[in-house]
């Protein structure tokens, strides 16, 4: 390294790195990621899937909320627009699923083993809840999208480490895939139910004979 910095000749440094790489492959082949995993991780880092999903869910959630309120208080419905919004939401959910799948392949374990992974998984379950319980109500879709955005935003705060790390020994169990996945996913459904309950209570204040039918979402 010193020779390369001084003379701008990196041949010896490259040879040393190549020898180190070969040594690692021989002595640590069970620990080192494969060439395919490294290639996928580079693609994963360039895509910045979860960071982009924060803006996606936030913008779509606010727009869905606007459309839902307009349909209730102004009695203006557009089935084609609602179907388009739902299709876009499903696309984002599938993109979110792809990100989790890539992280699972890269790390070699289920992607809900630390704080960052748990948050992005809860965001995924919140989006899944919106897909499952959506009944042509933009408020339901808006609540799901905004909840996912908030959870994903918290995941990308400075105190949360997004680095892919080795699985700690205490989590090296099939319970991580079965038990932890179900319990953690339930937070998304619980959060959506709570948020919809708050929205319903607020809308009851404005309920009258004209919008009674629309408010019974």
PLM features per residue range, with description:
Residues 1-217:
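Polytopic transmembrane helical bundles with strong interfacial aromatic enrichment
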């Amino acid at each position: 390294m010193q020779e390369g910095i001084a003379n701008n000749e990196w041949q010896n440094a490259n040879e040393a790195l190549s020898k180190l790489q070969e040594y690692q492959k021989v002595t640590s082949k069970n620990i080192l990621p494969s060439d395919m995993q490294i290639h996928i991780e580079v693609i994963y880092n360039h895509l910045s899937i979860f960071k982009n999903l924060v803006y996606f869910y936030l913008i779509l959630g606010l727009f869905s909320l606007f459309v839902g309120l307009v349909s209730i208080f102004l009695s203006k419905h557009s089935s084609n627009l609602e179907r388009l919004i739902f299709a876009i939401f499903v696309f984002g959910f599938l993109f979110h699923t792809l990100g989790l799948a890539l992280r699972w392949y890269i790390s070699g374990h289920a992607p809900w083993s630390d704080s960052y992974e748990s948050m992005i998984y809860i965001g995924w379950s919140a989006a899944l809840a919106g897909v499952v319980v959506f009944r042509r109500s933009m408020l339901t879709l808006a609540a799901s999208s905004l909840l996912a955005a908030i959870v994903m935003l918290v995941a990308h705060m400075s105190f949360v480490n997004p680095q892919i790390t080795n699985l700690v020994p205490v989590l090296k169990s099939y319970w991580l895939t079965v038990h932890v996945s179900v319990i953690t996913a339930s937070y998304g459904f619980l959060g959506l139910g709570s948020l919809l309950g708050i929205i319903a209570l607020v809308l009851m204040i404005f309920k009258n004979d004209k919008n009674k039918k629309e408010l019974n979402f």
